[in-house]
Each structure stands twice: as C-alpha cells, then as structure tokens.
C-alpha cells in the first residue's frame, strides 16, 4: 500500500516556498470547496477548544481560526510551524505547539469546562497509533474530525460480516461513535494521490455502552483473532481460553471473528479475566 502524508494547502506549494516531497508522499489539498466542507462539518464556535494536528501550510487553519476565539495547532515540522503566524488571520488567536502528536500529552490542553475538539489530516503510516494515542485522552475530548484514506475510514466504520470489519473497527467503536462524512477525490490534491480519501467524525463515549472487565485483554484478544481471521474462534484461541469459555459467553466456537459484534467480543474477552 502506498503511504500519503496529507498537508492541507489551498495555495500553490511552490509559491509558499514548500515543495511536495515524493519521499514523504506529500499531497496538498487545493480544493476550496473541500476545505469549506471540512470546516462546516467541524462547525467550530466561539469558546470551543479546537486543536489541529499537522496544520501544514494553514489552509484549514485559516478558516478555522476565523470561527474560533483561539486555536491550538500541533506541528512537528519546525519550518512549517515558524511560518504559521504569517499565513493566518488573527495570529493572536493562534497557539503553536511544536511537538510529535504521537507523544504529546493532549490532556494539558483540556479543561473540565472546555473539552478538546480535535481536527487533523493524518498520514496513513501513523494514523492507527495516533488514533489510539488520542483515545487515551477520550474523557477530555468532545469530538474528532480527521481525513484519511477512504479504505481506512471504511475499516473504522465497518460493521460485522463485512470484509472491512477488523481490529480497528472493534476497538475504535468500543471507545467512540464513528461517522463517515464524505469522500475527497484524488483530484482535490496536487499532485493527486492514487487513492480516494474520506473525512470522518469520532465522538468518544462519555459512558461506554459496553464495558469490558479488562480493556487490555479485549485489545489482545481482538488483535489476535483478526491476524487469523480465516480460522474459527476455537482454533484461533486455543490455549488462550478455558474449554467452557465459549459456552459461558454464549458464542459459537465455530464462528469466525468477522461475524462477532462488539458486545460478543467483550463477553469473550471477559472470560480471560479471573
């Protein structure tokens, strides 16, 4: 699979002094209609605690900051971070955090009165670990809006009994309510990537509708069975569960992992916990 790092830029990258680099797979979003649609989906309001991950050349940052009292951006590239105040209206509203989002403690940006609204265009190669890193701060996050390759978004929002359904589907849906919002065609980027992208929303549950006894056990079980998704649960989980675990969980041991609901995965993982 090709990896594309999305940096939003409604202008000509060369005019901005930043050339798309092939080795990083950078593709710059130039379609103003798509940018406007993203902002409408986020629907920022004065008083919102908005955090943008990877602002790049600020094409999304600019319309966002026009709707907010304040905007915090997390940018790893020092050169891009240094140029942001000159690229946005109301630079006095902008707070720039030069940090690796994968390691950053987002809790320090939130308060009880102002949970985070996180926005970003995530490169595929860090999207999964970054999503799970952000979920560590789920109790401090109101919602998240991201753009990724459509196939990844399809996996996040997938339902049981589909080929897209897997570990990412189960674990994201355990913590959040995901919503597929809209596709972004390759032609919206310069240069155009070879994949279609999509924008989606995640809303962390304030109270999870289904709670596992041990979330690490759930993650371990789900990850294990989907690495062997063609095997039956009995064969895949041999040695991990007691003989009567399937009966206690009310699950057919001959089923395959893609047929199980989130609730069934939780019931099965609970059998791993004394």
Curated annotation (Swiss-Prot):
Swiss-Prot/TrEMBL keywords: Cytoplasm, Methyltransferase, RNA-binding, rRNA processing, S-adenosyl-L-methionine, Transferase
Which transformation does this protein catalyse, written as a reaction? adenosine(1518)/adenosine(1519) in 16S rRNA + 4 S-adenosyl-L-methionine = N(6)-dimethyladenosine(1518)/N(6)-dimethyladenosine(1519) in 16S rRNA + 4 S-adenosyl-L-homocysteine + 4 H(+)
Gene Ontology cellular component terms for the protein in this record: cytosol
Q: This protein's superkingdom? A: Bacteria
Q: Where does S-adenosyl-L-methionine bind?
A: 27, 29, 54, 75, 100, 121
Disulfide connectivity for this sequence is none
Name where it mostly resides: cytoplasm
**The enzyme's E.C. designation:** 2.1.1.182
Q: Name one Pfam family in it.
A: RrnaAD
Q: Where in the cell is it found?
A: Cytoplasm
SUPFAM superfamilies in the cross-refs = S-adenosyl-L-methionine-dependent methyltransferases (SSF53335)
Provide a Gene Ontology MF annotation, just one: RNA binding
Its biological purpose is as follows: Specifically dimethylates two adjacent adenosines (A1518 and A1519) in the loop of a conserved hairpin near the 3'-end of 16S rRNA in the 30S particle. May play a critical role in biogenesis of 30S subunits.
Q: Which HAMAP family match?
A: 16SrRNA_methyltr_A
- State the similarity comment: Belongs to the class I-like SAM-binding methyltransferase superfamily. rRNA adenine N(6)-methyltransferase family. RsmA subfamily.
Q: What's the protein name? A: Ribosomal RNA small subunit methyltransferase A
Source species taxonomy: Bacteria, Pseudomonadati, Pseudomonadota, Gammaproteobacteria, Moraxellales
């Amino acid at each position: 699979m090709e990896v594309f790092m999305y940096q939003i830029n409604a202008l000509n990258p060369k005019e901005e002094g930043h050339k798309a680099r092939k080795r990083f797979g950078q593709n710059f979003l130039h379609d103003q209609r798509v940018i406007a649609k993203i902002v409408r989906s986020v629907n920022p309001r004065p008083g919102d605690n908005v955090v943008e991950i990877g602002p790049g050349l600020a094409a999304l940052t600019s319309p966002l900051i026009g709707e907010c009292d304040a905007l915090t951006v997390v940018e790893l590239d020092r050169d891009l971070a240094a140029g942001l105040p000159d690229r946005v209206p109301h630079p006095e509203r902008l707070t720039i955090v030069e940090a690796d989002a994968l390691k950053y403690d987002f809790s320090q940006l939130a308060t009880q009165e102002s949970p985070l609204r996180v926005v970003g265009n995530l490169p595929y190669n860090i999207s999964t670990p970054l999503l799970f890193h952000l979920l560590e701060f789920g109790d401090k996050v109101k919602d998240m809006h991201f753009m990724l390759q459509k196939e990844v978004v399809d996996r996040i929002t997938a339902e049981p009994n589909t080929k897209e359904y897997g570990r990412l589907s189960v674990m994201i849906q355990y913590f959040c309510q995901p919503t597929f919002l809209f596709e972004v065609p390759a032609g919206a980027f310069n240069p155009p990537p070879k994949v279609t992208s999509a924008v989606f929303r995640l809303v962390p549950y304030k109270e999870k509708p289904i709670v596992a006894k041990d979330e690490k056990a759930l993650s371990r079980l789900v990850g294990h069975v989907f690495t062997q998704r063609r095997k039956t649960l009995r064969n895949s989980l041999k040695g991990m569960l007691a003989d009567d675990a399937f009966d206690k969980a009310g699950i057919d041991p001959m089923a395959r992992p893609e047929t199980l609901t989130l609730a069934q995965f939780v019931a099965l993982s609970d059998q791993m916990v004394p």
